[in-house]
Regions:
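PLP-dependent aminotransferase-class I/II
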Residues: 100-110
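Binding-interface segments
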Residues: 65
Length: 110
């Protein structure tokens, strides 16, 4: 039996398939900052419907999502506890300190 491994710990581990590359090359695109990208607009509409929210925002990376989350939930001097293998500890550098004024404390997970 062939083992299939799916790596989800970081968006840097994924590679697009030939079909994905074809879809990207053929996609109708526009200026997302001006609300003119039909793919992003469709994604935002789907997200609003799925989660029952009145609006949505497109964030292009997991790092951006994590940093915004910490800025919203932490005050300067707060400490964020995370598993010692967490992306915010191992890969994102001092983003929490720079943007949220918070420190990351890695702990042993289970």
């Amino acid at each position: 039996m062939t083992e299939i491994r799916i790596e989800l710990h970081s968006d840097t581990q994924t590679r697009p398939t030939p079909g994905m590359r074809k879809a990207m090359a053929e996609a109708v695109v526009g200026d997302e900052q001006k609300g003119e990208d039909p793919s992003v607009n469709r994604l935002l509409e789907m997200s609003k419907e799925l989660f029952g929210n009145e609006d949505a925002v497109f964030l292009p990376s997991g790092t951006m999502c994590n940093q915004i989350s910490m800025m919203l939930h932490c005050r300067p001097g707060d400490e964020v506890l995370c598993d010692k293998t967490a992306h915010i500890w191992s890969t994102e550098g001092g983003g929490a300190a720079v943007f949220a004024g918070s420190l990351i404390r890695p702990i042993d997970g289970e």
